[in-house]
């Protein structure tokens, strides 16, 4: 199992990321989990490099790599032809953007990015000014988002023989489960986890601005009450799920499975194995 969740790479962030437990991993090797500290930088380019190496190692051992998770760009960086080294650079434009940032502030630059490249804006913290400026630099030069530019949209042999599966359900049921999940996180000690992370890492790092953490940090800063923080987290999670679904729905390679049709997760897993039979598995 190879995680394709951009938040699971961080150590000590367990409850807010719904990190799988040892019991849930059931002795099956899980990769790309707990590999960097929350105050360390970790990029999609680093993810791509590490996972490509992992896939080769797993295949060499005669096993089948399963890429699992919901960070669309992480998945696409591995299965498609993304090149993170060729985006154009313009030193003069970058300096102009830096001067603008000095005048209007990091938050205004992040808002500007959200208007032209919402995907990058969602991924980057407003204080990550270097990367915000880099994404703007690429957009202003090419008219494309940084992800669009990095994707080589030409006819090439696919990197892997693969099958893709997506899980979906009734929207209202999904939102109900999101509310239950947030309540469960709070019951399991999300507030304590965030307090300890802020103390240990001085509240620094892009990771602590991730979904489930920034909302609680807002409460700790006195911006709103704890019940309000919980409601904001539920709202933000619903919005994230909607954007996530929109991203994956655009990929016609995905075979969608309606979870409402199955009694339990085991039945869903059996359906996936049935769909894979003949290509990857001998049942």
Curated annotation (Swiss-Prot):
It catalyses: adenosine(37) in tRNA + dimethylallyl diphosphate = N(6)-dimethylallyladenosine(37) in tRNA + diphosphate. Its cofactor is Mg(2+). Residues 5-8 are annotated as: Interaction with substrate tRNA. The keyword Membrane does not apply. Signal peptide: none annotated. Its EC number is 2.5.1.75. The keyword Transferase applies. Keywords: ATP-binding, Magnesium, Nucleotide-binding, Transferase, tRNA processing. One of its GO terms (biological process) is tRNA modification. GO terms for molecular function: ATP binding; tRNA dimethylallyltransferase activity. HAMAP family: IPP_trans. Belongs to the IPP transferase family. Monomer. Catalyzes the transfer of a dimethylallyl group onto the adenine at position 37 in tRNAs that read codons beginning with uridine, leading to the formation of N6-(dimethylallyl)adenosine (i(6)A). NCBIfam families: miaA (TIGR00174). This is tRNA dimethylallyltransferase. It comes from Desulforamulus reducens (strain ATCC BAA-1160 / DSM 100696 / MI-1). The lineage of its organism: Bacteria, Bacillati, Bacillota, Clostridia, Eubacteriales.
